[in-house]
């Protein structure tokens, strides 16, 4: 089901979401996130961007192989010191692109749709997308990172 993108001034945009409540079926939420990310031509989308108050997001991990991750209760457990500045965009801010400095490599934990916990190292674009979507869960948008 395609949902309307929440405007940045909406309350869901500015508040931290503590954890996934499991009120929604995980498979339904995962499918909704993937469907909306593809519909809006994104490489990442957080649940609160489409009006769902859950700590979850979807992201493209590998553009070349179209590998998609759906992350529930994501956490960044380690950030490496080397930072890289790149231009970022956000589906919630159409046509706005800003230079944002972020760690190039991170270690993260998240749960998948089956509640299995994963611990992975991400670098490059995958690291950046994870951090951008993670920020949405923390009530931070990319305009605050410039």
Language-model features: locations:
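Positively charged
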Residues: 1-146
């Amino acid at each position: 089901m395609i949902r309307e993108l929440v405007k940045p001034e909406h309350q869901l945009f500015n508040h931290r979401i503590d954890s996934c409540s499991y009120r929604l079926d995980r498979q339904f939420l995962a499918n909704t996130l993937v469907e909306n990310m593809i519909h809006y031509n994104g490489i990442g989308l957080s649940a609160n961007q489409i009006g769902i108050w859950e700590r979850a997001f979807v992201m493209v991990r590998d553009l070349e192989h179209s590998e998609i991750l759906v992350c529930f209760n994501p956490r960044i457990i380690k950030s490496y010191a080397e930072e890289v500045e790149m231009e970022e965009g956000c589906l919630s801010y159409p046509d706005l692109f800003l230079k944002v400095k972020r760690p190039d490599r991170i270690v993260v934990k998240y749960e998948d749709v089956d509640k299995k916990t994963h611990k992975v190292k991400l670098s490059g674009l995958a690291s950046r997308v994870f951090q951008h979507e993670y920020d949405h869960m923390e009530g931070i948008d990319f305009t605050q990172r410039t």
